[in-house]
Amino acid sequence: MREKPLILVVDDEHDLLEIMSTKLSHSGFDVIVAYNANEAYDAAKKTHPDLILMDIHMPGASGTDAALRIKQDPETKDIKVAFLSNLKDPWPTTQAPKEGMAKSIGMEDFIDKTEDLDVTVQKVRDILARK
């Protein structure tokens, strides 16, 4: 068992990744990072984090693709995943609200990257507290 929850943060925006991972570290979490969907999948298999915060739109494979791959793999299917995006409507072809859409495909939640980081930290704590 880990002393602190391990969070994998995945984003192709390096500055945002640095800011978010620093905030999470200072808030009592161990943090690892990945810069694309393939790195995220590999890190998930290797480290089995308690939560993955996954950017939706990245070059190459999308965060949605990576999250679904993680959820379909028997070794990683129980890892909690929450989507990150700064888009008001990350799935423009659906009528579902973004939080509902994330949950409908097996993700824990949707986190708006433009929110105050204290709100993000609280959402992370809330997600980890869920059974």
How would you label these PLM feature ranges?
Residues 55, 85:
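Active-site residues of response regulator receiver
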Residues 1-6, 116-131:
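Non-catalytic signal-transmission and effector/linker regions of two-component phosphorelay proteins
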Residues 28-35, 43:
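Short hydrophobic/Thr-rich beta-strand motif most characteristic of the beta2 strand and flanking loop
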Residues 3-15, 20-24:
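Conserved acidic segment of CheY-like receiver
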Residues 17, 59, 68, 77:
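The feature encodes the CheY-like receiver
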Residues 13, 56-57:
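The short loop immediately C-terminal to the conserved phospho-acceptor aspartate in CheY-like receiver
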Residues 65, 87-111, 115-122:
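Alpha4 helix (beta4-alpha4-beta5 surface) of REC/receiver domains from two-component response regulators
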Residues 35-39, 62-68:
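Acidic catalytic/metal-coordinating carboxylates
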